[in-house]
Amino acid sequence: MALDVLTDLKKVRNIGIMAHIDAGKTTTTERILFYTGINHKLGETHDGASTMDWMAQEQERGITITSAATSCYWHDYQINIIDTPGHVDFTVEVERSLRVLDGAVAVFDGKEGVEPQSETVWRQADKYEVPRICFVNKMDKLGADFYFTVDTIKSRLGATPLVLQLPIGAENDFVGVVDLITMKALVWEGDSKGDVSLGAKYETREIPEDLQDRAAEYRNQLVEAVAEADDELMEKYLGGEELTEDEIKAGIRKLTITSQAYPVLCGSAFKNRGVQPMLDAVVDYLPSPLDVEDVQGHAINDEEEVMTRTADADGPFAALAFKVASHPFYGQLTYIRVYSGKAKAGEQVMNSTKGKRERIGKLFQMHSNKENPVEEISAGHIYAAIGLKDTTTGDTLSDPSNQIVLESMSFPAPVIFVAIEPKTKGDQEKLSTAIQKLSAEDPTFTVSLNDETGQTEIGGMGELHLDILVDRMKREFKVEANVGKPQVAYRETIKKAVEKVDYTHKKQTGGSGQFAKVQVSFEPLPLDAEELYEFDNAVTGGRVPREYIPSVDHGIQDAMQLGILAGYPVVGVKATLVDGAYHDVDSSEMAFKIAGSMVFKEGARRANPVLLEPLMAVEVRTPEEYMGDVIGDLNSRRGQIQSMEDVTGVKLVSALVPLSEMFGYIGDLRSKTQGRAVYSMQFDSYSEVPKAVAEEIIQKNRGE
């Protein structure tokens, strides 16, 4: 189905659907596609037939792993949607989609309210200043409570909710919503699955009597919030005049786009209720590419020189590659957001991040994993391109004669590793291909060679992340491999400063020798600092020639990678080169690199080195009767309980627990609570390992 790409950017919305893992995000997206006429049959997540979940494992596990991009039309607006995963192991997918969106719909579970993962995704959206509307889903669920969910948006997210609708009925009796702008009731008829039109039709009625007082109260709050944001409206409001519907809508739009408040709507995507008014809200309140600030970047040779690009098809071409995926027929698909200008298939563009020219092959607008070919791409839209061989996630593509480097994305380092060993020589080649393709797609998937064991190790953001990557290797790339037990990504650091550590590297063997003398001071950096390593040059009077200074820095960094105590990389160090000496003939870059490496080993041993481990923020929701067992179990895993609170019929326990103690936790939790408790965890910080535990790890690593 060929769809036109809208050139009037006022009528374009680039949005993401974001939420906790089970809030019903993919179902909501499916309904959007159904009502906007792209899907003629509804896909259900629990049937494994969902359009947006197109990878085999997504359909099996019923969770969204990669963010599929889709374009659809509502009234005469074009909505480009990215469906993002809600599982914490896939933060990279959420980060990269938020980077290129203009707005988002945050989906909440009407029974659970704001859950840990919703909080994480919300904070990521704050980081990129993405305006949002909230959709309280699953209003048909037992125990659903709209007002509780609105309270948690305030209390857990610290956000200002702007309630635009109230639910009519609850649980099985949920039939529709009160629209507080028009002060009418919207009611969906039909059975629980909707009638023949699958909830596509709803009736506008008068507000039920039992809701009239509450609706009037919430309407007043809404009008007051809108009036406060605009002096003219405030005057009108204080003068006792009614605000018109258009004025209220314009006020809500202003509050939303500036992220001062977040409109809240409700419904049940699964029961086909409330989706169309939510689409109206996307169009009415979320920004177009013209409403957001110009995208910033810097000049190719000077990071200090700030440059901007405006959403204008006639401007110089600038786009950001935000995802790379393997396609069964086309090979590598690169998803890009075009910020300014336009480009045609077959044209050359510049990858200004890498300084390489790229030729664009075919261009598509995507519908999940189906492609709609287009001849030209232009500002304000999201596309997929083929033929970009050197482009990876976070790279900028720009006009060769007017280059810019857009702000890239930063991704967290992996916290968990497994060794992977191909079964045959043929598998070795397949494994190399798989690793190359998967690491191009996913920047949080890392590969390294363990020098001691000679094994290939892959790293990721959690057990589920690595499970799925290994599963993809077997399924998509037909790799047969043995996979080891998960290993924790420990780190090392120093705790005290050491002043002026001397090291002289001297070697005299026939012909020219090697000579380098350095004096370096080391001090610890806080582990939450932006940079975990700093190098300063405080040498005066040319005692170490300028050309050798980077070699000292590289030598120190090389030694840090090899560790002090147990061979784990060292972080949190500031090194200052204070003094040194050189020889006209025998000094070289290599000699100073070796001296840098050795002075670090010497200094670090004296600087009270310690082992660090990743701590995970764990949240457990458990019925009250199992609370004691859950807390006792977390304590036995060296957990520190942070808080306990009541949340709709269950207890919520928050704790910080070392990752090394969390393997296999889900099985233990199920057996202790008869399967009634659920948990989520995400990386929090690195923390010092207790002495007794550290000694065990060090001995094991040294093979003692």
From Swiss-Prot:
Molecular function GO labels: GTP binding; GTPase activity; translation elongation factor activity
Assigned keywords, A-Z: Cytoplasm, Elongation factor, GTP-binding, Nucleotide-binding, Protein biosynthesis
Top-level division of the source organism's lineage: Bacteria
GO CC list: cytoplasm
Binding site for GTP: 19-26, 83-87, 137-140
Keyword Protein biosynthesis attached: yes
GO biological process: ribosome disassembly
PROSITE patterns: G_TR_1, G_TR_2
SUPFAM superfamilies: EF-G C-terminal domain-like (SSF54980), P-loop containing nucleoside triphosphate hydrolases (SSF52540), Ribosomal protein S5 domain 2-like (SSF54211), Translation proteins (SSF50447)
UniProt xrefs under NCBIfam families: EF-G, PRK12740.1-5, small_GTP
Function: Catalyzes the GTP-dependent ribosomal translocation step during translation elongation. During this step, the ribosome changes from the pre-translocational (PRE) to the post-translocational (POST) state as the newly formed A-site-bound peptidyl-tRNA and P-site-bound deacylated tRNA move to the P and E sites, respectively. Catalyzes the coordinated movement of the two tRNA molecules, the mRNA and conformational changes in the ribosome.
Similarity annotation: Belongs to the TRAFAC class translation factor GTPase superfamily. Classic translation factor GTPase family. EF-G/EF-2 subfamily.
Protein name per UniProt: Elongation factor G
